[in-house]
Structures are given as C-alpha cells and as structure tokens.
Amino acid sequence: MHSPSSTSFTWILITLGCLAFYASLSDAQLTPTFYDTSCPNVSNIVRDIIINELRSDPRITASILRLHFHDCFVNGCDASILLDNTTSFLTEKDALGNANSARGFPTVDRIKAAVERACPRTVSCADVLTIAAQQSVNLAGGPSWRVPLGRRDSLQAFLDLANANLPAPFFTLPQLKDAFAKVGLDRPSDLVALSGGHTFGKNQCRFIMDRLYNFSNTGLPDPTLNTTYLQTLRQQCPLNGNQSVLVDFDLRTPTVFDNKYYVNLKEQKGLIQSDQELFSSPNATDTIPLVRSFADGTQKFFNAFVEAMNRMGNITPLTGTQGEIRLNCRVVNSNSLLHDIVEVVDFVSSM
C-alpha cells in the first residue's frame, strides 16, 4: 500500500503538472513547428490519405479546400463545420452555403482516424482540416508551404453564423468585400487570391441559372458573361434541366491548381457572378490590377494565395485551453473533464 505521504506527494506532482500543462497551453500560439515533436509525420499521414482518396474521387482536393474556407469564415478555423446535429446545436452542414454542396466529410474522418492511430489525442480536427487543405492545393499542382498549427476544436456549431457569414455565388463585389472584411480579411489581395481557389473543382447548375437566363430579373443573361461561354453553359445547364448537374469552375484546366482562373476572368468566363465581379464590376478598381497580375504570373498568384491562406487560417483560432482536441471530428468529446484529466496524466508522465 502507498503511505499517506507518498499519496500526497503524487497528488502534488499531478497538481504541479496540471499547472504547468495549462500554463503551457495558455501561452500557445500558432506555429509550423507545433507538432514537430508530438506528431512529426502528421503532414505525410494526411497527404497519403488524400492521394489514396484521389484514386476514386478526383474532386476531393477542391472539396477539402472549400471545407477549410467555409470552416474559417464561421467563428474561425475551429472545425465547427465538421460537427453533426445534436440536441444542443444545429450543424453548419445545413447552412445555405453548405447544404447539398459541402462534401469530403468521410475523407476528413479517415484522415483523422489515421492521425489518431499514429498520435492519439494530439492533433485537433481544425489542424487536420488545415493541413488537408494545404496538401490538397499542392497535390493539385499548387504551392507548398508550412502551415501554422496549434488550433483547438470548437465545442459547438454555428448554423446562424454560417448563414450570415458565408459568401454567396450571387454576391456583388461590395458584398464580397464586406463578407471578407467581417472576418478580418480586409485586403483586396485576400479576396482576389482566395477566390482563386475556384481554379479547380465544380459547381452545380442551380447556382448559375439566373446568370444564364434571368439575371437580376431582366429575363436576359448576365451582360458580363462571354457570349460563347454563355452558349456552352446553357448546353450544360438547360433551362428546364437537372440543376444538380456539375460544371467545371475552370474550363481550361479544371483539375489543376494554377492561375487560369484569372485568365478566364479577363475573358469574361468566370463561372459564378461573385467570381466575375472581381474583374467586371464598376467597383473593381482595386481588384482588376490583381486579376491581371495573377493572370500574367503564376508565382505571383501562388505567393499571394499562401499569404492569404495563412491570414485566413489565423482568424480567431482557439488555442491553449480553449475548446478541445476532438477524438471524432463529428462530435464533441463525450466527457470533456475526463479527456482533460487524460491529457494532464499524459503530460505528467512525460515530465
């Protein structure tokens, strides 16, 4: 049996460990080296899963990038978009900008499971999604960069905020600027570079029908739409056709992450209104030069995109003792107190 003195000493150690643990977390900042010791292979684990997913789903890289974008625009990059419905909150998956369009959730589940097997209770779902977005861009031909990490996961979802914050495909340029500025992305380069995420992936016909047939209730197509491209889109999305049919965002290189999106905008071949607004809106005096610059130089776009991604990834992140590290990205941990105790015991054991 343990003596009372040894038991007391053990609890003192645990208490000191708790204090050190929470003190270390409270000062946490996002850094690319966050998992260098605790989970050094996390990026490779994520990358390998995505490579495997691409064999059966060529759209998955674009879908994961979109998930990350829609996560960060709603209460910051906290993996709240991954949560399912509960009796306490409604899922963001049913928001107007996500319902029947956001995809890739099973892939994120598989990535998280693989990461958990390698590094239990270590890497948050928010960081898993952030790393997955970066790897997806690179696997599609885009830039590679070291992602600042150290985010924690939210304890709830924010359906109303998702409906309020997510930019819509019919937004005008002033509306786009307001939506981006609301979350701290107030530079024209943020808007133009991040919109370049539409250089790959697909969109449903239902989001462009008004542009093709009845723009602003005029009974006419959007006048900023290239007439040849208009006819191509009308063939793919007939007036009384299936509006769930998928159309490529980029008619030139639909599966490659490159700068052709901006070349398309210069030729009035942006698929959705909010894209073409960057070049054709009367208010586009500060975005047109950026579109031209990115169309002329891939590296200029890549550099601006990486900077904007890091700025977006830093929107009010949960760090330190905030939130939790979810074990299953779809649900909050069933007993957060027990989970905290396990984290503390692990920390003390490593001292």
Swiss-Prot record:
Domain of life, source organism: Eukaryota
SUPFAM superfamilies linked to this entry: Heme-dependent peroxidases
Site (Transition state stabilizer): 66
Glycosylation sites: 41, 85, 214, 226, 242, 283
Cofactor remark from the record: Binds 2 calcium ions per subunit. Binds 1 heme b (iron(II)-protoporphyrin IX) group per subunit.
Residues annotated to bind Ca(2+) 2: 199, 250, 253, 258
Role summary: Removal of H(2)O(2), oxidation of toxic reductants, biosynthesis and degradation of lignin, suberization, auxin catabolism, response to environmental stresses such as wounding, pathogen attack and oxidative stress. These functions might be dependent on each isozyme/isoform in each plant tissue.
Protein's recorded name: Peroxidase C1B
